[in-house]
C-alpha cells in the first residue's frame, strides 16, 4: 500500500522561487498606486513619532549604487520604526539648483548661445532639465522598494521652497550674521564663480617649486647693520608674486644670514644648504621680532614687501619665510588683517587672466595684461633674473573644482559670508554650533569628533555665487552708498512674490514691481544684488522649508535623524547645522548616521574606465532588488562597502535560505485555524525560548542600526537552529501525527507564532518578500491584514528553555558521528539508529525526536556502531541500529514486524 496519501503534507501557494526581477516591479507599482504610505500613517495615528529627513540627491543623471545604498538604508530604518509601531514620516526630496545643471544646459545649447540668452530663459532650461531627472530618479528610487511621500516630495526649485530658502537667508541677515567683504575664496576660473570648501576636491597637479630672493631695503639693512642681504621665500605659485605684499616669519623661530647674503630660518638652514639654496656658514642670527616691520623689495616690480609674523608659518618645508599675497591666500589674508592693513592687491579677473590692475599698479609689464596666470608662470621666472635662486617642477595635491575638474585658485573678491565668529547676543555661531553638536547622537560615534573638528576650523561660509541657476540673494542695495537694505516689509513682499512666481521674479520684475506699495518711491535709488546662493545653503535650509514652514507632512523639527555618506560632515550636515543654529540656535537633527562608500570586491573605487561599475538598475534586473536590499542589510556600512557579482551571488544564496524557511513555515500551518499553545512540547518550548532570545537581540541591534550584526545572528539562527534542527525535527509530527493531535497542533501554533514575528522582523529589509508571504499566508497568520503593512512586531512571550547547552553539544557530537557513518555507507538515515545511554537528561520523552532517531533507551540490544562519553566520563552515549523494523509510513524503525505500521501510524490511519 502507498501511504503517501495518508500523510499531512505541507501546502502553500508561496512559490519556492521569487522570480524577483519579473515580480517586484508589479508589486511596487501596486503599493504606490494604492497609497501604502498614507495607510501606514493611518495605521499608527497617536503612536510615538519618528521622522528621517531626506538629504536631497542632485537632480542630474541616473542614480548610482551609492544612491541605492543610501536610500535603502534610510528605507530600512524608517520601516524598522514603522514595524515597531511608530508613526513614521519620510518625505523624499531633490536638490535642483546649481552649477552642474547649468553646465548640462550649456553643454546642450553651447556656451555662446547660453551667454546670449536672457537669464530667465537660462533658468527655464535649467528647471526643465532638473524636472526631467527628478522623474527618472523618482522611478528608480521607487524600484528599490523605498516607501515615502512620493506624491508630495520636496524640490528646492518649487516656488514656495525658493521663497523659504530666501526667508531663511533673510532671518540670518536680520540677526546680523550676513556680512559682505572682499576675502580670498576658492575660485573656479572655468565656471567663473566662487566655490565653498565642500565644492573642492584634491587631485594631482604639476607645478613649479621656486626659491626667490627679496633684497632687503636700504633702511632694513641699516637697522640690522648689514651691507648685503635678501630674504628668501619659497612658493609653488609664481603667478601670485606680482600681488606679494609681505613676507611672514614664525614669531618663535630664529633666522640667520648666510655667507652669500640670504636670510632663512635657522632650523631649515642645513636642509637649504644641501639643496644649494644658501651657501657658506652662518654669519649672523636674528630673533624673528628683530625683522618684524622691516621691508624687502619685490624683485618683479620694485614694490615694498613688509616683514610680518604669523603662527601659520611652519618648519616642515620651504625657507621659514612665507610669501604673503593677501589677495590670493586665506592665511595670508588673516595675518594681513591682524596687522591692520587695508589695501589688498588682487590682479586676476574672473577667467584667471591678469587684469588692468597690473598696469595701473605697475605690478608687471603691460604685455601681461589679459594673459592667463598659468601661461604667465614661465615668463615671470624669466623676469626674476638672478633673484630666482632655484627652480624645479614637482607633482602635488592641488584643489580642483568638483564639477568641471579644473584647477581652482584663491582669489579675493567681494562676496557674502555667514560670519562664524561675529558676536551676536553674547555668542558666536561657531560656539553655538559646537555646543549643539554635543547634544547630537552619532552613528558611528567617530562622526561627532569629525564634525566638531571641521566646524571648529572652518572659515566664514562664503554663500554667494556668480551664476544664473539658483536662489538669488534677493536684497537691494543703495546705489549711492552701496549699503545693503535689510527691511522687514520689503523682505516680506519679496517672499510673498517668490511663493507665487518663484525666484525667477527677481529677474523678471523691475525693482518697483518687487517693492511693497509703501516703498515704491525708493525704486530709483536702489539696485539689485546679482549673486545667487551657494546650493549648500539651499540644502542647508531644507529643515526650514520642509519641517518648519512648507506644505509637507514630513514630521517635526528637529528631525529624529539625518542619514548620508561620511562626506556630508563637510557638506549637508554642516550647512544644515549652521543655518539652523543661526536661526533657531539649535541643531536641526537629534541624530546623525553616516555610511561609507561603495567599492568593488578588491576595495577599489568604481569607474567606467576600470569597468568595475555596478549599476543598481542592472542588479535589480539580474538578481532582484531584494538581493540589493539584503546586501545593504548584511554589509558593515561604517566603512567602505564592497559589491560585485560574486558578493551578490552569496547574498542571493542567503536570501534563498530565508525564503525557503518562510515557505516551510507557511506550508506547515496551512490547516491551522487557531493559534493555541495548550501544552507545547519540549522542542516547541526550546525553539520559542531561542526565538525570543534571538528576536530580542535582533530588535535591539536594529535599534542601534547595526543591521549587519543583527542579520548575521538572525541568519545563523534560521539556518542552524530553526531550519536545521526545529523544522527538521518537526517534520514527523507534522506529516504523520493525526490531524488534530495535540503534539501536531502545538508545533503548528509554535511555527505560526514564529513566522508572524519573523515576517514583521524581516519586513524592513525584505519588504517585497514578506508582503508576498502575507499574500500567500493562511488566515491564521494573515488575520485581517491587507498586506504586510498591516503587521506590527510584537515581542514573543518569554518561555523557559528546557534544552541546555550540554544537550546541544551532545547532539553536535552525535551528528558528527552520523556524518561519518553516512560517508562510510554504514547507514543512509538517522532513523535507522537508536541511542543507548545512562544519562537521565537524554532519557526523556521527545529526545528521540530531537536527535532524529527512532529510539532512546537505557538498554538496547544489538551491535554498537560508535560511542562517546559525556560529563567527565560518567555517562556514555552508544549509537546502535534500532532493533525494530522500518514503518512504511513514517520511516521510523519502530514497527514490531517487517512491513507493518508502527503503533502511532496504525492509530493515525485506523483511529
UniProtKB/Swiss-Prot annotation:
Domain of life the protein comes from: Bacteria
Residues annotated as binding ATP = 608
Location of the motif 'HIGH' region: 57-67
For this chain the motif 'KMSKS' region maps to: 605-609
Q: What class of enzyme is it?
A: ligase
Q: Any note on cofactor binding?
A: Binds 1 zinc ion per subunit.
Q: Where in the cell is it found?
A: Cytoplasm
Which sites bind L-isoleucyl-5'-AMP? 564
For the ligand (Zn(2+)), the binding residues are 887, 890, 902, 905
Q: What is its EC number?
A: 6.1.1.5
Offer a single GO CC term for the protein. Answer: cytosol
Alphabetized UniProt keyword annotations? Aminoacyl-tRNA synthetase, ATP-binding, Cytoplasm, Ligase, Metal-binding, Nucleotide-binding, Protein biosynthesis, Zinc
Described purpose of this protein according to its UniProt entry: Catalyzes the attachment of isoleucine to tRNA(Ile). As IleRS can inadvertently accommodate and process structurally similar amino acids such as valine, to avoid such errors it has two additional distinct tRNA(Ile)-dependent editing activities. One activity is designated as 'pretransfer' editing and involves the hydrolysis of activated Val-AMP. The other activity is designated 'posttransfer' editing and involves deacylation of mischarged Val-tRNA(Ile).
Family of this protein:
Belongs to the class-I aminoacyl-tRNA synthetase family. IleS type 1 subfamily.
What is this protein called in UniProt? Isoleucine--tRNA ligase
Q: Which organism is it from?
A: Nautilia profundicola (strain ATCC BAA-1463 / DSM 18972 / AmH)
Underlying gene: ileS
